[in-house]
Amino acid sequence: MEQIDFFARVLGHLGPVTVSDSLLTSVLVAGLLSAASAVLTRRRTALPDRVQVVLEGIVSACENAVRDVIPTAYREVTPFIMSLWLFLATANLISLVPGFDSPTRDLSVTSALAVLVFFSVHWFGIRQQGLSAYLKHYLTPNPVLLPFHLIGEITRTLALAIRLFGNMMSMELIGLLLLIIGGLFVPVPVLLLHVVEGLVQAYIFGILALVYIAGGIQSGPQQENHSP
C-alpha cells in the first residue's frame, strides 16, 4: 500500500529554510500560474479569440462573485480571491499528474494559506476603514469582549487550515481505498471524484476567505454610516 504522509517530506535544507516536496510543488504551481498569466495577458486583442473569451468569462464570473459579497471594495479584493481560487484548484488537481502530490494535503501548506487569509482580512479592513476605526470594532459592543474577538480570529484561522487539510487528506484516503477494493474497475470514477472534490474545496476555501474579508471591511463605524 502506498504510504500517505500527513506532513511534508523533507528533501534538504537551503540555509535556514527547510525544503520539502510540498514547498517545491507549491512554488512550481505559483510559477506555472504566473507564467501562464504573463503569456495569456500579452495575447489580448481587441477582437478576442476563443481562449480570450473563456478567460474573460472566468474573470467576469469571479468579479461578480466578489461584488455580490463586497460591493464597495470588490475591485481591490477580486485579484486576491481569484489568485486563491486558481492556486488552490491547480494545487488540488496537480496530484493527477504522475510523480506529484497535492501540496494541500500537507498541513503546513494549508496553515500558511490560512495565515495569509488572516493577514489579508486585517489588511483590507485597515485599508478601507483606517487603523483606528478598524481596531475599534474589537472593543464593541463592550471592551470586555476583546479576548473573545481575539480567540475567534485565531480559531477560525485554525479551522480554515484544518478543514482544507482534512478534506484533501480524506479524499486521498478514500480514493486509495476504492482503488484497493475495486482494482481496475474504479479508476475513472475516482479521477472524476478527485477533480470535483478538488475544485469544490478550492471554491469553498476562497468563499470563506471572501466572507472573512467582507467581515473585516464592513465591521465598525462604516455599517452605522450606511444605516437609515
From Swiss-Prot:
InterPro entries the record matches: ATP_syn_F0_a_bact/chloroplast, ATP_synth_F0_asu, ATP_synth_F0_asu_AS, F0_ATP_A_sf
Any one GO MF annotation of this record: proton-transporting ATP synthase activity, rotational mechanism
Cell membrane among keywords: yes
Assigned keywords, A-Z: ATP synthesis, Cell inner membrane, Cell membrane, CF(0), Hydrogen ion transport, Ion transport, Membrane, Transmembrane, Transmembrane helix, Transport
GO terms, biological process: proton motive force-driven plasma membrane ATP synthesis
Bilayer topology: Multi-pass membrane protein
Membrane-traversing stretches: 21-41, 80-100, 106-126, 173-193, 195-215
Keyword Ion transport found: yes
GO cellular component: plasma membrane; proton-transporting ATP synthase complex
SUPFAM superfamilies from the UniProt entry: F1F0 ATP synthase subunit A
Annotated compartments: Cell inner membrane
Family: Belongs to the ATPase A chain family.
Summary of the function given for this chain in its UniProt record: Key component of the proton channel; it plays a direct role in the translocation of protons across the membrane.
Subunit structure, as described in the record: F-type ATPases have 2 components, CF(1) - the catalytic core - and CF(0) - the membrane proton channel. CF(1) has five subunits: alpha(3), beta(3), gamma(1), delta(1), epsilon(1). CF(0) has three main subunits: a(1), b(2) and c(9-12). The alpha and beta chains form an alternating ring which encloses part of the gamma chain. CF(1) is attached to CF(0) by a central stalk formed by the gamma and epsilon chains, while a peripheral stalk is formed by the delta and b chains.
Name of the protein in question: ATP synthase subunit a 2
Classification of source organism: Bacteria, Pseudomonadati, Pseudomonadota, Gammaproteobacteria, Methylococcales
